[in-house]
A protein has these predicted regions:
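C-terminal active-site "lid" helix and adjoining low-complexity regulatory extension at the edge
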Residues: 230-233, 247-251, 260-301
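Short glycine-rich anion-binding loops that position phosphate/pyrophosphate groups of nucleotides
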Residues: 70-72, 148-150, 275
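Active-site nucleotide/adenylate-binding loops and adjacent lid/helix of ATP-dependent enzymes
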Residues: 2-8, 14, 20, 24, ...
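Protein kinase-like catalytic core scaffold
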Residues: 143, 203-204, 266-271
Length: 301
């Protein structure tokens, strides 16, 4: 039997009646109905899954997905891309196109390509209330809740207890800015690398480290210190992952944030920034010099 999943922003009697009629017209076809709140995305140990909670299946188990309506563009696009990669037919392929900064969409592109990110879990705001145990089980303690659209260290909280989780979620449910959160395993580190990749090539590397242990954020916008690191000092795996992440994200002027777990030595990609503080932040002239070289190279092609 073939299986179709219909997804909409909210469940309605009219939609259920339509889907029941369609199912009756198509022998050997099962149509399941879900809303976006029913979907949970996980990136665990290098594997991406999209769980359809109300059916018990993975999105990849379906033969076709009918996106009756869309939620926030990058979230819908993440589901579309996942379906297509798993040979699931999609009624609206155009919904898979997205250009903009989104941690969730970026992870959906780079994780299947073998680039490591910290274990992560994403659910719509409607599923967050009372979900602490699930996040703790999947990610361990402490973990981080961060906004998928946030930048410069904004909307980024360490969760050490149920009270922390409930507090951050309460804010998420009352603020558009913090409405869409991804949970992520905490990575102990001694700073991170902002790797500027222009045209698929690493051009400049800046090490950023938090000012003190009162915060977990290394961003210079949050008071972190910055130091230029010679490119030749980077491990080959970090250079390769940075180039690949920028290329897969189709961002010509990218800031790839890489971090090393100081306990395990493993490298992770935090995100790929489409606006990597070129006009502001640390070492502006160094960034501008590299940007000028890149522009000239492109113009001469």
């Amino acid at each position: 039997m073939k299986k179709i999943l219909a997804i909409s922003t909210k469940r309605t009697d009219a939609a259920e009646a339509m889907l029941a009629y369609l199912e009756g017209r198509m022998p050997q076809v099962q149509i399941d109905y879900a809303v976006y709140d029913d979907l949970v995305i996980s990136f665990i140990d290098g594997k991406m899954r999209v769980s359809v909670e109300n059916t018990g299946l993975d999105l990849a188990d379906y033969d076709m997905v009918y996106f009756k309506s869309s939620v926030v563009h990058d979230i819908t696009a993440t589901y579309v891309q996942y379906a297509l990669r798993n040979d699931v037919k999609v009624t609206d392929v155009a919904k898979g196109a997205y250009a903009g900064g989104s941690k969730l969409y970026t992870y959906g592109i780079i994780v299947p390509a073998g680039i490591s990110v910290p274990n992560s879990l994403f659910a719509m705001p409607g599923r967050l209330v009372g979900a602490y145990d699930r996040y703790e089980q999947a990610l361990g303690l402490p973990f981080v809740l961060k906004g998928i659209h946030a930048s410069r260290g904004d909307v980024n909280e360490v969760i050490r207890s149920r009270d922390d989780f409930d507090r951050v979620v309460a804010v998420a449910l009352t603020s558009d800015k913090k409405a869409y959160l991804i949970g992520q395993s905490f990575v102990p580190n001694e700073g991170d690398l902002r790797i500027l990749v222009f045209g698929g090539e690493v051009q400049l590397v800046i090490h950023r480290q938090r000012a003190d242990e009162s915060t977990h954020l290394n961003n210079t916008s949050q008071g972190g210190r910055a130091t230029i690191v010679p490119i030749e000092e980077l491990p080959a795996e970090v250079i390769a992952a940075s180039r690949s992440a920028a290329t897969l994200s189709e961002i010509g002027i990218a800031g790839v944030d890489m971090v090393k777990d100081k306990e395990t030595g493993k490298w992770y990609c935090f995100e790929v920034n489409e606006g990597p503080q070129m006009a502001t932040g640390s070492y502006r002239q160094s960034k501008w010099n590299e940007l000028a070289k890149y522009f000239m190279t492109e113009l001469e092609k």
